[in-house]
Structure formats: C-alpha cells, structure tokens
Amino acid sequence: MRLPRTSGILLHPTSLPGPHGAGDLGPAAYHFVDWLQSAGQKLWQILPLGGVGPGNSPYMSSSAFAGNVLLIDLAELASCGWLTDADLVPDPAFRDDRIDYAAVIPWRMARLARAAQACAEHATPAQRAAYEAFCAEHASWLEDYALFMALAEAHPGRDWADWPAMLARREPAALRSAATAHAERIAFWRFGQWCFFRQWQRLRAYANARGISIVGDAPIFIAPQSADVWARQDLFELDTDGRQRVVAGVPPDYFSATGQRWGNPLYRWSAHAADGYAWWTERVRHTFTLVDIVRIDHFRGFAAYWEIPASEPTAVHGRWLPGPGLALFEAIAKALGPLPIIAEDLGIITPDVDALRRATQLPGMRVLQFAFGGGADNLYLPHHHEAATVVYTGTHDNDTTQGWWRAASQAERDHVARYLGRRADELDTDIHWTLIRMAWASVADTAITPLQDVLGLDAAHRMNLPGEGDGHWAWRFDWSQVRPAHGEQLAALTQMYARG
C-alpha cells in the first residue's frame, strides 16, 4: 500500500520531558504534537508501546497487546481523585536528560497501585461502566495478560516454565485457583491497561485532529517471558515443558563475528498456518486500533529466519529456515483489507526478501547513514530510492547523525562530500541538516528523522546500540533544547520538497 508524500519525526514517548522521571502521555506529549504541526510534519513515529523488558527494551515486552503502564500520566489520575498532590511530588533522584529505570519503575508503580485502590473504592458509576466495558472488549488478551503478570509477581525471578507445573501447563483448575488467589493484583493489571488505553486513545485522537498520524512498531518476535508465549505455547517452538528448543537471532556479519543471539522463541509456523494465521491477524488488527501506520520489524524473518539451538551461547551455529512468506500477508489482507504497513527490510537482504516485499506491495526502508560505504551502486544512496520507500537519516538503532559523522571513516566522509559537491570539513557543523535535506528531497514517499538529528545532538544522545544490553532506551530531551529555528527550518524543507 502506497503512502502519501509526507515527513515526520521519530521519538518514543519515554523520551518526552516531564517531572516524573520518564516521558509519559501527559502535557508534554500534547505539546510535542503541537510542535509537529507547527513544523509542518504529518508523522510521529514511535517504538513499540508495550512494557519494557530485559535491558529496558520496548522490543521485549511482556505482551504483544498490552500497553506500557509506565507511560500513564499520573497527573490525570490525580484529576480523577485517585492520587493526591503529595503523590505527584517527584523523586529528587530523577533526571531530566536520562531515565533511571531503577528509580522510576518502583516510584511509578507504587503510585499506580494507590490509584487502582482509590478507583476500586471511589469510582463513579460512569467510570466503573467504562472500566467494565474496556475489560469486556479486550478480554481475549487482557485476562491472560493480567493473570500472567500477577503470577510473575508471585514467582519473582523465575521463568514461567519454572512455575508449578500445573500453572506452566495452564491446567484449567490451577488457573481458576490462581485467579482467585491473585484477584487483587489481576484487578491492578487490568486497571493499568484501562488507564493506558484511554490516555493513549485521547492523545492519538488529538494528534489525528491536527493532521498527525502515528507510526507504530510491531516487533516480529515475542519475548520468551510474555503472556503471549505462556498463553499460546502451541504457536511457538517449545518443548513439552515449555522451554525453548531454538531461539531467534541473526548470523555473523561484517559488524559482529558471532552474530546476534536475541533469545526470542521462534514461531511454529505450521501451527499458525493451520488456523489461517489467526493470532497474527488479531495482533495486526489490535495494533491498528492504537496507531495509523505500522512498521513491522525484521521483515526478512518472514521470508527466512535464523534458527539457533537454545543451548548455543552465540548465533554462530544456526541455520536459515523458510518463513511463512506471502501466505501470512495474504491471510491478513483477506481479513483486514489493505493496510499501511512499512517493511523494515534492513540487514541481510537476499533476493527472496526483496521479492516478498514487492509481492506484498509494502514500502521498504532506506537509511542514509548506510549510504556512503561502498560505491555508486549502494542502494541506500538517494539516486537508487524508489517512491514506495521510507527514508531515514537514521533509526533508533543508529547513532545520531552528528555521532555517526564524527565516527565515520575518512572514506565515508569524502564520499558524502563528493556526493554533495562540498568539502568534508564544511559539513562538520551541519551534517545533520544535510542528511535531513537529503532525505526530504528523496523521491521516497516518506521521510523520517529522529528528533536528535533535528536538534543536532551528538552520540551521547543515542537511543540504542544493538548488541549492548545495558544503558540504552533512556534518552530524554528538554524543551530548552528546541529553538524556534528548528521547527522553522524543518517546515521550510517540508514545503520545499512537497511533503506538507
């Protein structure tokens, strides 16, 4: 499905300013939408909206359907009468420029628990009706999620496969008993989702009303310690005890001699095919209730994926296996119709991957930071772009453009300079705007840049470094960094290259 000629900014809500240690769905999110509109932008791209997992990654969430309760605007809960002004006083340890998850998570969760209790005791009839309607509408995933989260709390530090066997195997009598024993915590997790969904939908409606579409992100793989894997063990490559036989990753390449062992469970694609890809169809349908456009991560895994024995410590000793291919996308399209999906086709892209993307008619991705290694045949260079493409200066996995430039080889720097007809030393101060202009000028239908590049920030402001487990996903900006000239220059480029 072709996308209109537009442009936008990549920024996860956790990176927004705010007093409570991490960005959330409060006033700063609405201010950011207003800024996007004033800068002439039409897209706000985010990372996955689920809760953070190991290493605080949003790509390892405990559910493919649930939202991140850490994003809940606590001030809005106070306006409902569920928190006090004293509850909203920030911890002095909170930082404006980085998220200290070790401090933020317990602080926010304690206040969410207080709000849940107050709501249970003092909710109005209208609030109770809205809560019950939400629970009924989302029961297909919400009940498993809430029970899973309650059981995970009751068995701290243990994989679900190490829970009592009756719970790990999901024996009905054991589940009923657990639901009774953990009723209060189950209600808490339901409440958190209700708060997240109503706040998120309000923000999304605000953005849509101002001409801003939300670009979401759907990881191909699911976290092993997730409600999805526990609830649908038949759909994943697990042994009879619920343990992973094989895990996901990518093989060794130029950047990594041992590859990347992600550790996600792999899909049992034969089981998905047997029921017409119902789980995937429902996942995609649900995702589109939250966002307007979806980027599917690691698209190449649908053509073929790298299978690694779970016993292997690295990704070296794996093998390629065929993915579901076109059949999955045909099943989704048959059920849901044509959808605005972006295929993240970065990495090892073989002819079968490109053929699948073209058969699905999904736009792929081009990243300009990858364009200047090699010669004129590098497909990331703008003269090779196609209209059905999304071009980025960099993604959340890249360095900032200023950081990339400072670390680039002399050959890369010279290539950029020759390509632009300039001297390399002339680009030191404005390389970020140079790449933004290059992206906006591209024939690609969609152009996106991280906010860090608009602000000209260096490598210290990078969002993620793949393969490094700690210290990432923590970057935040402050409005003092955003000058009027930033929005004005972005708006001028957007108008110049007909992306408004």
Predicted regions mapped to residue ranges:
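Terminal-tail/helix-coil boundary detector
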Residues: 479-500
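Catalytic domains of carbohydrate-active enzymes, especially glycoside hydrolases
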Residues: 27-52, 289-291, 439-441
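Outer-envelope exported proteins of Gram-negative bacteria
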Residues: 47, 213-215, 219, 293, ...
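Alpha-amylase-like alpha-glycosidases and glucanotransferases acting on alpha-linked glucans and related
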Residues: 1-5, 10-12, 55-197, 222-448, ...
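Conserved, well-ordered alpha-helix/loop/beta-strand core segments that scaffold catalytic motifs
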Residues: 189-221
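Mature N-terminal, pre-catalytic/accessory segment of carbohydrate-active enzymes
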Residues: 1-40
